[in-house]
A protein has these predicted regions:
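Long, contiguous binding/interaction regions
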Residues: 1-103
């Protein structure tokens, strides 16, 4: 079963302001995007499990025109605050890379 890192063209994260991070998973072709979408694996519920936040606090969007999935979720620590280890939010996508997708 392939992992997100093996089938997505892009998997990245970044700050969406000081209190949220956004994660994008983008596919190179429509066929693979549709196969992944059909599995339902990439979801707010998955993000909630991976990032330990309630699913209700996650804004999850399937962006058909961009062949992408996008999740915006609250940061545990505000960007740049004491204890923040990723001030730009650029490493937050890492747990998603190892998710198996049954395509």
């Amino acid at each position: 079963m392939p992992k997100v890192r093996e089938i997505a063209q892009v998997c990245k994260s970044k700050n969406a302001g000081p209190f949220e991070v956004t994660i994008d998973v983008v596919f190179a072709d429509k066929a693979m995007f549709e196969r992944v979408k059909k599995t339902g694996v990439l979801s707010a519920e998955l993000m909630a499990r991976l990032y330990h936040v309630p699913a209700d606090d996650i804004l999850f969007t399937v962006y058909d025109a961009g062949l992408a999935f996008k999740a915006t979720l609250p940061r545990r620590i505000p960007a740049g605050d004491v204890g923040d280890t990723d001030v730009y939010g650029a490493q937050q996508h890492a747990p998603l890379l190892e998710v198996d997708i049954p395509v």
